């Protein structure tokens, strides 16, 4: 089983990304999802209503307090959820773990996630990639989402591309408009090639 951690600020598109990925990959792979919310099961409920996955393949973890603690310093609640999911479905090939909405410094504990995808969005401005932080600089894949909003918020995608290249060096990044399913195929290809080590 490959565990893929997905984190990023509130509203960047993490839940929508997971919903799109499960829709694209469900027929070919055995999938499951763990979501993290501070005080509610909101993301888990959204996934249950909108995902192609049955609700028993989705676990919502209520982290309380700081969401980044539950994915890094004290990942015990999430590790228990991983264990529970493996007991329910021993055949799981990909487990997506969504962090609670957090800032640019959120990262996953290596024992919780094998790979990390960090999602930011254009609406936060074109300066976000150059601000750096562990998510932008060290994640295995950076997704710059909501590219359709660039003209409305005055964000320059060329500047974002330049800064992402500079901050990430050789690490990959992708531009997406998840709501319109733009760029999702490229994310699926990245997962197949780098996380599942498939020859595409």
From Swiss-Prot:
Subunit composition and interactions: Homodimer. UreH, UreF and UreG form a complex that acts as a GTP-hydrolysis-dependent molecular chaperone, activating the urease apoprotein by helping to assemble the nickel containing metallocenter of UreC. The UreE protein probably delivers the nickel.
Gene Ontology molecular-function annotations: GTP binding; GTPase activity; nickel cation binding
Classification via NCBIfam families: ureG (TIGR00101)
General function of this protein: Facilitates the functional incorporation of the urease nickel metallocenter. This process requires GTP hydrolysis, probably effectuated by UreG.
Entries under SUPFAM superfamilies matching the protein: P-loop containing nucleoside triphosphate hydrolases
Stored CDD domains: UreG (cd05540)
Gene: ureG
Organism: Helicobacter hepaticus (strain ATCC 51449 / 3B1)
Example of a GO biological process term: urea catabolic process
Gene3D superfamilies linked to this entry: P-loop containing nucleotide triphosphate hydrolases
Pfam families referenced in this protein's UniProt entry, alphabetically: cobW (PF02492)
Keywords: Chaperone, Cytoplasm, GTP-binding, Nickel insertion, Nucleotide-binding
Subcellular location field: Cytoplasm
Effects seen without this gene: Cells missing this gene do not produce urease; addition of Ni(2+) to cell cultures does not compensate this loss of function. Normal amounts of apourease are produced by the cells. Has no effect on hydrogenase activity.
Gene Ontology CC entries for this record: cytoplasm
Protein name in the entry: Urease accessory protein UreG
Location, primary (coarse class): cytoplasm
Protein family membership: Belongs to the SIMIBI class G3E GTPase family. UreG subfamily.
